[in-house]
């Protein structure tokens, strides 16, 4: 029996955005100085972080110049990504943001988690030190877990339907952006230097009339 050529469509794709801030080195140096001062004064929070320092969720309200500058950059980057993904978004919707600092010393990591209640989640990379062991390419990498269910093959056979993962280790000055439902975790920092990132969530709200 003859049949037509199969017509394949991809459904339920997950957008993943990478943006690099141009000439970020000077901004990152100022951020590191401001963050160090905050660490001396603030005890930090316990969230998905293991052994690291997690600031309050107040990035977008901070008075420090570099914090404020980065907050503005994040607003613009999230807005640009949203416009590209959803150009016909209703005009009465606006994005509200929250953000925080993560400082991860040696062996610190972030346990698997997602960010319910938001639309976008993201991370900006301030300092990404190399592992003390040059052969360790996973130090401080962020790993995303395929949100789809998978066929129960017990890991014996890789197929397009097998639950997968995506791992990336961005350079300093890079911002990653993904849908907040996407579960992820951060590999342990295997460097003697602190790894420093800025994480954030963005959600929609109706603009006041």
Residue ranges, per PLM feature:
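Short helix-to-loop capping/linker segments positioned immediately adjacent to catalytic or ligand/cofactor-binding
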Residues: 62-65, 85-89, 108-112, 130-133, ...
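Solvent-exposed residues in well-ordered beta-strands and their adjoining turns
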Residues: 20-22, 104, 125-127, 201-205
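Short clusters of hydrophobic/aromatic residues that line enzyme substrate/ligand-binding pockets
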Residues: 53, 142, 186
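A short beta-turn/loop motif at secondary-structure boundaries
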Residues: 91-94, 190-192
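Non-heme Fe(II)/2-oxoglutarate
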Residues: 2-88, 109
């Amino acid at each position: 029996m003859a049949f037509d050529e199969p017509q394949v469509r991809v459904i339920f794709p997950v957008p993943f955005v990478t943006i690099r801030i141009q000439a970020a080195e000077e901004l990152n140096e100022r951020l590191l100085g401001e963050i160090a001062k905050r660490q001396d004064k603030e005890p930090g929070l316990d969230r998905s972080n293991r052994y690291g320092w997690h600031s309050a969720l107040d990035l977008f309200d901070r008075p420090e110049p570099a914090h404020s500058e980065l907050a503005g950059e994040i607003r613009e980057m999230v807005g640009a990504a949203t416009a590209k993904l959803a150009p016909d978004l209703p005009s009465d919707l606006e994005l509200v943001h929250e953000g925080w600092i993560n400082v991860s010393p040696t062996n610190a990591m972030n346990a698997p988690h997602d960010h319910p209640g938001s639309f976008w989640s993201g991370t900006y990379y301030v300092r990404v030190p190399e592992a003390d062991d040059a052969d360790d390419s996973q130090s401080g990498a962020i790993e995303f877990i395929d949100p789809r269910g998978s066929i129960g093959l017990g890991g014996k056979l890789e197929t397009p339907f097998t639950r997968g993962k995506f791992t990336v280790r961005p350079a300093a000055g890079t911002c990653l952006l993904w849908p907040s439902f996407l579960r992820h975790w951060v590999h342990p920092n295997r460097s003697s230097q602190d790894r420093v990132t800025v994480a954030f969530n963005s959600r929609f709200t109706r603009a006041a009339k």
